[in-house]
Amino acid sequence: MDATAIHERWSVMSNASIGQEIGVEGLTGLDVDALEISDYVDETLLDGEDLTVTMIASASCTTCICTCSCSS
């Protein structure tokens, strides 16, 4: 599975979990240290190897999204 496929899979699962866009206002008071990748990844859909790769990709994507959103 390549990085693009991993990111697309993460995006679909993340959007299904969140279900809505939150603006910068929604990030006020957000404790980024308390965020868990497992909150956004349905681990039952992945095998062991896919899960490891996806969680690593998710961590980097989540960090980027949070950083970009918070710095706006």
UniProtKB/Swiss-Prot annotation:
Propeptide residue intervals: 1-55
Modified residues (2,3-didehydroalanine (Ser)): S58, S71, S72
Keywords per UniProt: Amidation, Antibiotic, Antimicrobial, Hydroxylation, Methylation, Pharmaceutical, Secreted, Thioether bond
Compartments it resides in: Secreted
Keyword Secreted attached: yes
Cross-link for (4S)-thiazoline-4-carboxylic acid (Thr-Cys), residue positions: T63-C64
UniProt function note: Has bacteriocidal activity. Inhibits bacterial protein biosynthesis by acting on the elongation factor Tu (EF-Tu).
Protein name: Thiostrepton
Organism: Streptomyces azureus
